[in-house]
Regions:
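Active-site glycine-centered loops adjacent to acidic/histidine catalytic or metal-binding residues
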Residues: 51
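Structured mid-to-C-terminal alpha-helical surface segments
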Residues: 1-46, 56-62, 66-68, 72-328
Length: 328
């Protein structure tokens, strides 16, 4: 466990251009990831995703990301998963408590998700928290999970973590942008574009991931992509949600970024007829992933727990005969 000295943190944060307290949170987050990687169970069963994976393993820390979002990484029967889940929770709890964190009442445990909120007193003497979320229903992935290096300029020791594939991470990130229209999502997707992370040959798979996660992630699959929602990000949210995690002096030109992102997404987010059939069937409670994927990708997600659960729920709501998770 690294020591969090107020003066040292202040100097380092100033050198890097970040807010000290937010910088401290990322240092703590990195410490937790280091513990995960050194644990035989946590390192194999938990895959990093979301903004933290983007900014710590794909890009070179363009912004700070302050939550640890994870997927259970192995597809296994529910009973086996629950046994492993209990062991994972126990190991995380013991580590966090031994290092001065206290589990907050804001923590939640659902059948699909564990959301652990751990409170601590930061180096400035203020109360703060670190959130660790583990999704157990997203334990199937379109692409194989990969081990990636963590890029943090202040770390001397090499660190790598198990991670969801970058294409799949950004597929889910684009879905988040088009549905919750958060400033940080817009920032991350814009960085995907400006850093040219994916070439033309990868855009087809990126679109398929957006199609897939737009179906299983919401109450209803879309009929088309709501790219116009990019325009709903507000200037106020830049000040409140984005600037606190950026380097001092960095400016975010909202209108220009919105136009660039809209143009880029419009260029490849055009669902095929087959993908529209997938959406239509999913809305009726029928899981037909073969209209989106084939080969190894199809095999990996054909028994996707979240997709099957969503379809069973839809079937029950419309009082139709249940379909037992088959690929036809």
């Amino acid at each position: 466990m690294m020591q969090f000295d107020r003066m040292a943190l202040g100097r380092q944060a100033k050198e890097l251009g970040f807010v000290r307290d937010t910088f401290e949170k990322v240092c703590r987050l990195a410490d937790v990831l280091k513990f995960f990687e050194g644990d035989d169970l946590l390192s194999e069963y938990l895959a990093l995703k979301g903004g933290t994976a983007i900014n710590l393993t794909i890009l070179d820390l363009p912004r700070l990301s302050v939550d640890i979002d994870l997927d259970f990484s192995k597809n296994m029967p529910r009973e086996e998963m629950l046994e492993v889940r209990e062991m994972l929770s126990s190991r995380i709890s013991k580590y966090m408590e031994a290092n001065g964190y206290r589990l907050s009442p804001k923590s939640k445990n659902h059948h699909a998700l564990d959301s652990f909120v751990y409170e601590y007193q930061n180096a400035g003497g203020m109360k703060d928290n670190l959130k660790i979320e583990i999704n157990y229903m997203l334990r199937c992935h379109v692409l194989p999970v990969v081990r990636r290096k963590v890029y943090l300029p202040w770390m001397t020791d090499e660190l790598s973590v198990l991670s969801v594939d970058p294409i799949e991470i950004f597929g889910a990130k684009i879905v988040a942008l088009l549905t919750r229209t958060a400033t940080r999502d817009l920032y991350d997707v814009h960085n995907m574009i400006t850093h040219e992370l994916f070439d033309e040959s990868q855009l087809d798979m990126l679109r398929k991931c957006v199609v897939f996660y737009s179906a299983i992630g919401g109450e209803h699959p879309p009929k088309e992509f709501a790219i116009e929602n990019v325009g709903k990000v507000t200037k106020r949210s830049i000040t409140t949600d984005l600037y606190p995690v950026l380097r001092h002096g960095e400016r975010f030109e909202l209108t220009a970024v919105q136009n660039e992102v809209r143009t880029y997404l419009s260029g490849f987010l055009n669902p095929t007829k087959e993908e529209q059939i997938f959406w239509s069937a999913f809305e009726k409670g029928i899981y037909e992933p073969q209209f989106v994927f084939e080969g190894a990708e199809l095999q990996r997600i054909k028994e996707h727990p979240m997709a099957l659960w969503k379809c069973r729920s839809k079937e029950q709501n419309i009082k139709t005969e249940p379909v037992k998770g088959r690929v036809r």
